[in-house]
Amino acid sequence: MIEVVDGATDDAAVARIYSDVMRWSTTTPERVHYFRGAMPTLRDWLARVDGEAVGAARCVELPDMKESEAASADICVLPAARQRGVGTLLFEHTSTHARSLGKTELEVFAYEDDADGVAFAERRGFRCIMRMRSLRLVLEGLEAPSIELPDGVSLTTLAERPDLGHQMWEVACEAIPDIPIDSDMPMRPGTFEEFHSLHLAGPRFISEATFLALHGDDVIGYGQLEWQDRAGGIAVHEMLAVRRAFRGRGVAGAIKAAQISWALETGLDELRTGNEERNVAARAVNARYPYQPTPDGLLFRGPIASDTHDAE
């Protein structure tokens, strides 16, 4: 028997399922709990088969989706429990919640080597709207890169200058909409309060690894490392953004070098990142280092399930 309960029933089980299915984007119970509290529109569920937790899902209107026809969803089922209707039932729950938010579509993520996950989306009429070229940088034996700053540019961190968080958000407001995506709305960081709760607080946030590029007193770029697996020594490049007027001058390269140097000094084992395949400039910065490819991340978009019954 398949039973679907509120995700808050067991954060540890939800985190384990997400991590097992996503593999390259692991999470923790603390992050699951924090994200739920930070996102007022979020609903999540845990699926059990004969009492065993085998699936997890969530649906939320992210800050950049307020004017979009889509909501964001994660639907994860452990491989051994697939082809038994668990994913379909979770899809119905996410669709019902998306409909309550006034949405007609969902955006879901899968890695390209998860054939079942990709097929699940494609069978339901979902199309790929973004392909992330995913990479990992193993730090063992890597020499610290030199940090070459353009004239008039200096680096600091949010740990040293916590007063610069609002300027960092202003850079995000300019840079994030430039990320290529085949969607009805460009990507956006949301309000400062939303940006702060998602990127400047919580268990993933590392203030001393949030680098800010300054031109005089003005923030012109930033780059964040966030924890992927703190116990395992793995951090992820969450975002690297530069104001349009300062692009092509080496600002992004200096921030990337500072991030890698910090990771080496801190004793991390690995950094992970991903860039939309059309983001040529960002991929060129990564090409300077021995990043190794991992399975591409695919963002799909498609229609919610038909309104056959109330899955809530």
Language-model-detected regions and their locations in the chain:
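Active-site/acyl-donor-binding loops of N-acyltransferases
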Residues: 124-143, 209, 261, 266-312
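Short amphipathic alpha-helix that is part of the acyltransferase structural core
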Residues: 1-34, 46-48, 53, 148-190, ...
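Short loop/turn motifs at secondary-structure junctions and domain boundaries
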Residues: 35-39, 201-206
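Acyl-donor-binding surface of acyltransferase catalytic domains
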Residues: 52, 79-161, 298-302
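Glycine-rich acetyl-CoA-binding "A-motif" of GNAT/NAT acetyltransferases
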Residues: 52-55, 116, 129, 207, ...
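Oxyanion-binding "anion nests"
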Residues: 180, 196, 202-205, 211
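Conserved donor-binding loop and adjoining core beta-sheet/short helix segment
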Residues: 8-11, 15-112, 215, 220-243
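Conserved acetyl-CoA-binding loop-helix of GNAT-fold acetyltransferases
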Residues: 83-96, 123, 242, 248-261, ...
